[in-house]
Structures are given as structure tokens and as C-alpha cells.
Amino acid sequence: MTGLSRSTAGLEPRRKRLLFRAWHRGTREMDLLMGRYAESVIETLTEGEMDLFEALIEVPDRDLFSWIAQGEPVPENYDTPVFRGLKAYHTHDKPIDL
């Protein structure tokens, strides 16, 4: 997978920006974690949830990756329903199909 796999046609500008930023994090691992999750939920996020997702996008890759993949404690201000959804989306018991 090289990035965005869905069309952004029909998405409002804010959702398009969020999707783009989720797929262009800086590290490939975080591109995959954030981008795939964003693709799955971008159309259903409320305004408030988009605010929370934007806050997560601002977190440095190393910190966010450690919270998602390495079980490091999540600061209270980032332990939101959107973060928990992102983490749950990537909790699995089989290899990820790249």
C-alpha cells in the first residue's frame, strides 16, 4: 500500500485535509496507523471528533506510536474516544495485510 486508497471526492475540505495529514505523518509506520484509521472513519466523524483527531495529528510520531503500539501510558488530555478508537482499530491477533 502506498497511501490513500479511497477517493476524497465528495468530502468537505476539512475532512480532506485530515485524511491527507493522516497519510503524511513523517514515518511510514504512523502513516499506516493514522491513514488507515482515518480512511475508515473520516466520513462519520463529528465536528468534535475531528477536533480530537486534529489534536492527535499534532502529537509527535514517536509519542503517538508508543501509546498505540508499545502500551506506554497516554496523557489524560489525549486519552479520548477518538484515540481509543484509533488504538482499538489497530488491535488485532493476526498480521496486518500490507
Regions found by a protein language model. Give the residues of each.
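Positively charged, polar, low-complexity stretches
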Residues: 2-98
